[in-house]
Amino acid sequence: MADSLLLLKRVPSRHTWLRARKARPQLMLSRRPRRRLRNLRWRSRRRLRRRLLQAQAAGADWLQGGCLVSGDAALQRLKTSARRRASSPEPAEDPVPSGPAILPIPPVRPAGSGRAVLLLPLGQGFTFSGICCVTCLYGQVQVFGFTISQGQPAQNVFSTYTHSRLTINAVHYSVHEKSKKEMKREARVLLRPYLNQDDRYCLMSSFSPLCSIVLLERLKTSTVNFIISHPGLSYIFVQEVRTFQINSEYFALRSVGIRREKKKTGLRLTESAFAVMEELVSISSEEADSCPVILVCGCQDIGKSTFNRYLINQLLNSVSCVDYLECDLGQTEFTPPGCISLLNITEPVLGPPFTHQRTPQKMVYYGKTSCKNNFENYIEVIKYVFSSYKRESPLIINTMGWVADQGLLLLIDLIRLLSPSHVVQFSSDRSKYMPDLTPDFVDDMDGLYTRRRSRVRNRGFHLPEFAESLEFADEEKEGPVMSTGYKLMFVKSEFVTGKTSRNRESHNRILRELAVLGYLSQLQPPVPKPLRALHGLTPYQVPFNAVALRIIHADVAPTHILYAVNASWVGLCKILDDVRGYASGPILLAQSPICDCVGFGICRGIDMEKKLYHILTPVPPEELRHVNCLLVGAVNIPQCVLKSQGGLEGTIPYVTTDYNFKLPGASEKIGARESGATYKEKGHPKPKFYRKTY
């Protein structure tokens, strides 16, 4: 008896897993877990077994001494502990929300070759990488802010590795008075053409009210095929990653051409961004005559372009058209780089810029990816393009990420000239300081070409009634005076990017080259026809005396002008001057014109004997009849286009290692190569690698 009492006193001091072992039977594992258990190390195996035993014994009530408590005694003890908690002065815990629990996503079911069916419970999201065609068979889903409902056309979705992964979210939708049985019967009928009986039964076992069913199909486009045909660019859409979860869902998604990703890799917007978008969408849809002009500004790599795409898709859910004014020369959204354009967007934007190159309503080829050397021409081009806006649809204005020093003054000029109704200003903890662009701040600041609303000298007293009677000097009267009245909206950004000060320029250059490739893909025949090499396509022959020439970004001697045009990216433009009166050419312009640009092309050759330019372009012939000017800027043909010319023997045309840097304009022609060489000569210290600790 004494020994038993002594044992009872020692029991509480023992470890929990020892008590669990005595109270419960020995843990039985199946064959596969036992095999995994043998492969673990001794310490990991011991830790795993302890956790399993603790989980197995979690439901047992303990009494000092190791004996189980009867049901009545356990109930009495629970009531006693509840009374103690009620009488305790400590604050109560937060109540658990009483809303319905979010159900898990069932496995994706194969629906034939290159097709799969996905069931999403309400509130769940499917994050993926790759490209596919999304059709909503039942319910309603949202991708990148655009809502896809049952019966609507399929949408091409591009979730690339150059940007954040996209997510298919199941959203709430209105249901007429139907029982769960009727909804289930309707969904089963819709699934009959796609799934066999067994897969249909397994999928419908996870059916719940307000869930959505999506059909994922393999997507093949000439744009994707053309981009991945170049060496080193296939990783943009598909990346083979080693996985340990090889099951039926893995093979079903692989046949579609996508891969399931973790939720944390998907696109995430802050609450402030959603609040701003909700207000802007409400203003655009509820008021019939309201066409807000929304200017989005902030420093670079803070998420402005992502916000603009999401906002466009949100607006297209309620309005038929959204206008878009592109003022960012380096990272354009719908055109090749170096352009200022105005577009009418009627289709959702479900991918990065190089997947949705479109024809603008009005476009001017500025010819550079930055305006730092010619602010006045930049302002004049924006005024020229903005004059075509008819105020029939909401307008989104995208601005540059240069908001320091002169860039801030230039932004103030844009706000005054474009007169937006709403200004969305982005900020983050890691971005440089940017003042709040309130209407009062803008009115009290001088821009580069506009001046503040009032310039009253401070004479030691404040008498606003005498402000109009004061006389100013001539230099104080220069520049137009424009007052602003808009609503300032703030977005706190938590956008995470892999760009740094060292790799930002190379990263941006890759995105610009992808945009050019996306534009050139319009030369390819539609799928399923095979791709054709660019040097195998028939170019247009343009006489010297039919078009004028101008090099925008540099001063080139007239004797070397054709060297600069050959094998260059050219803008096909329309000028008001008549150039048909010249007997021979080339015809050179003395200054860069501000004129309409109908598209772009490649000057793949010049015939000096017949005096012909050979132009390769996707612009239709009816538009080419009006082209009478070729503009050459700092935007170059991607190197992969020149290097990957198949079917050629010997040296590749336009690719050489012997280059004369003394030619006028030679340094501007290869500015990117020079900057890369300068970067290597600086001798930056090698990056240090640290081991991660957990």
Curated annotation (Swiss-Prot):
Its main location: nucleus. The keyword rRNA processing applies. A motif (Nucleolar localization signal) lies at residues 31-47. Polynucleotide kinase that can phosphorylate the 5'-hydroxyl groups of single-stranded and double-stranded RNA and DNA substrates. Involved in rRNA processing and its kinase activity is required for the processing of the 32S precursor into 5.8S and 28S rRNAs, more specifically for the generation of the major 5.8S(S) form. Required for the efficient pre-rRNA processing of internal transcribed spacer 2 (ITS2). Associates with LAS1L to form an ITS2 pre-rRNA endonuclease-kinase complex and is responsible for the transport of this complex into the nucleolus. Residues 80-101 are annotated as: Disordered. One of its GO terms (biological process) is maturation of 5.8S rRNA. InterPro entries: Clp1/Grc3, CLP1_P, P-loop_NTPase. It catalyses: a 5'-end dephospho-2'-deoxyribonucleoside-DNA + ATP = a 5'-end 5'-phospho-2'-deoxyribonucleoside-DNA + ADP + H(+); a 5'-end dephospho-ribonucleoside-RNA + ATP = a 5'-end 5'-phospho-ribonucleoside-RNA + ADP + H(+). Interacts with PELP1, WDR18 and SENP3. Interacts with LAS1L to form an ITS2 pre-rRNA endonuclease-kinase complex. The modification N-acetylalanine is found at A2. One of its GO terms (molecular function) is ATP-dependent polydeoxyribonucleotide 5'-hydroxyl-kinase activity. Belongs to the Clp1 family. NOL9/GRC3 subfamily. There is a cross-link at K477 (Glycyl lysine isopeptide (Lys-Gly) (interchain with G-Cter in SUMO2)). GO terms for cellular component: nucleolus; nucleus. Residues 472-694 are annotated as: Interaction with LAS1L. ATP binds at G298, C299, Q300, D301, I302, G303, K304, S305. This is Polynucleotide 5'-hydroxyl-kinase NOL9. Gene3D superfamilies: P-loop containing nucleotide triphosphate hydrolases. Its EC number is 2.7.1.78. It holds the Pfam family CLP1_P. It is an enzyme of class 2 (transferase). It comes from Bos taurus (Bovine). Keywords: Acetylation, ATP-binding, Isopeptide bond, Kinase, Nucleotide-binding, Nucleus, RNA-binding, rRNA processing, Transferase, Ubl conjugation. It is found in: Nucleus; Nucleus, Nucleolus. The keyword RNA-binding applies.
